[in-house]
Amino acid sequence: SDLSASQNTEYLQSIGAVIHFGHHEAHIDNAEVVVYSSAVKPNENPETMAAQEHGIPIIRRAEMLAEISRLNYTLAIAGTHGKTTTTSLCGLVLMKGGIDPTVIVGGRLNGLGGTNARLGKGEWTVVEADEYDRSFLQLFPTIAIINNIEAEHLDIYGTAEEVQKAFIEFSSKVPFYGFVAVGLDDAGIRSMLPHINKKVVTFGLSRQCDIRAIDIIPHERSTEFTVIAHGEKLGVVHLNIPGEYNVKNALASITVGLHLGIPFATIAESLKEFGGVYRRFEIKGMNNDILIVDDYAHHPTELKSALSAARSGWKERRIVAVFQPHTYTRTRDFYKEFGLSFDDADIVLITDVYAAREQKIEGVSGELIAQAAKNAGHRHVHYVPNLADIESKVRGLMQAGDLVITLGAGDITKLSDSLLSAE
């Protein structure tokens, strides 16, 4: 059940799932187990409360993911940024490599027909390991990937140090015959390295990495680079998504693929065929010579990465960035950092906060970020608090030859669809 219809519920209904809108105790009739997400408070929800009364097991979604994945060897992809794309890349590499994995991703993967999962017959399960609410600590990965570590979800962890402790605990769950693959370019990873007591394999752009990329050439919709593994030049990869940050995501999948014995040529072919992930630098299309892009970025580092990819690939286009902050706590904790994230955008529009699971915090709004961007020296920042007004404002500013990118984890994606379809 869910509170309202969405693309996800519509898809599930199309393949035969029975979906209830709203929560009611009658919905659990004949259920053998009730699984709830981190958005649900089990002591307040009528379905979980009824399950408890009737002796039906209730478990968190993260626990169900752990139960599914422990049936196989598990490749778990963690990190503050890049989890969904890296999980998708790893899944594709293993699929092309003949391993036939089960794949469970936190986003809709174009290569899986727009779904977020596939059931394989092989011995490996590839899962996205979310650190929110410490969910990833339910998993017992055979191989763990940690792309990067930054302060995030401080409403849960409180401090950056507590975030790092959780990732250290996650790495400790890897058995002696597995390994932890880490993105060595990241400062958070480097400070964590002395505390990892498992085998470590490093990837990134640094010369100190076990698996690294050199000669990176950005194109509009793709990126070309050469792979060096343990000092040996393996060859060139044509990655079918833009952005240097995606090169690092791809290196994680290359690291795992090589370890599992997949030929480099097969790995490179997989990355060339990668169809992307819903809302991860998703190029929606062109309208009157205006390129429309949509991205899930909702952390300062993610904004910088997405806008850098736009600038690297489309140097001649003016970039119009439309950002919807996600959650009041994140806005409160990082508004100054957000203000420093828009240098690659020519024009910035910021709307009010998408609350998600949170209650409004007095004095916290998108205006904090807009003012921080102005204070940091950005010359063209517009605060448009009402999302209903944002489309007309964008239309008044954009012109032929622009790249318009919508950014955020809320419902700002609807704007990209409107801009694409309008005459």
Predicted regions and their residues:
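Short internal beta-strands
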Residues: 1-3, 179-184, 320-323, 344-355
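C-terminal helical cap/extension that packs against the catalytic core
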Residues: 339-400
